Amino acid sequence: CIKPADIDGDGDMDFVLGNFGLNSKIQATAEKPAYLHVGDFDKNGAVEQIISCVTEDGNTYPMVLKGEMQRALPMIKKKFIKYKDYANQTFDDLFSQEQRDGSIERQITTTQSSFLINDGKGNFSLQALPYQAQFSPIKGIQAGDFNKDGKLDILLAGNFFDSLPEWGRFDANYGLLLEGQGKGKFAVKLSKQTGFKTLGQVRNMALVKGGKSTYVVLAKNDDKAQVFKF
C-alpha cells in the first residue's frame, strides 16, 4: 500500500510504502533479486505462478517445495522421482527456454517497507522503515498528528495468513505507531505503549472525523471493522 505524506516536513510530498517486510524466506536485494515467473510452463492451458530467489551461490532456485510444484506441474513428478533429486535444481534446470517462452518475469530488489523521500528536485530516495515495521506485511497506513504534539505520526497495520504451510502465517504486526520527532525522524511505539492494538489481517485503514474527535477505522479480511479514537 502507498500513503502520501510530507515525511520530512520540507513542504513537498513524500510517500510511505507498505511492503512484505523482512520476516520471510524472500530476502531480495539488488545483487540477489527475487523473481515472479508467470506462464503456462507445461503448455496445458493453465497458468502457473512461481517465485524464485537468487542464493549465495549465484543461482536462481524456485521457492516452492516439490509436492506443491508437482501438484501444479505433474511433469515435475515424472522428471524428479525423489525429493533429493529436486532439491538442488535451479529454475533453469527445471524449465527449458522453450517451456518459458511466452511467460512473464518480474523482478524485485527489496521487500522492505520504506519511506520514499522527495528532495524537491524530482529525485526520490528509499529509506527503510524501522526494523519493527518489517516483521509482517504492511497493508494499512495512515498519517496524522495522533498525539497532538504538532508533529506528523504514522500508523501501520497489516499481516497476511493465506500463505503455504511451509511459509507459515505472517502475523507479527499488532499495530505500530511511528511517533514523529520532526525532520523525518520517528520513535517506534508498540501497541502495548499506545493502545493501538489490532489482531488479524488488516487490509485498509481510514481516518473519519466525528465532532472534535478523529477515528481510525481498520478494515479486516473476514472480520469486523475495528475503530480507534484519537
For each feature predicted by the language model, list its residue ranges.
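Beta-propeller-forming repeat regions
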Residues: 1-230
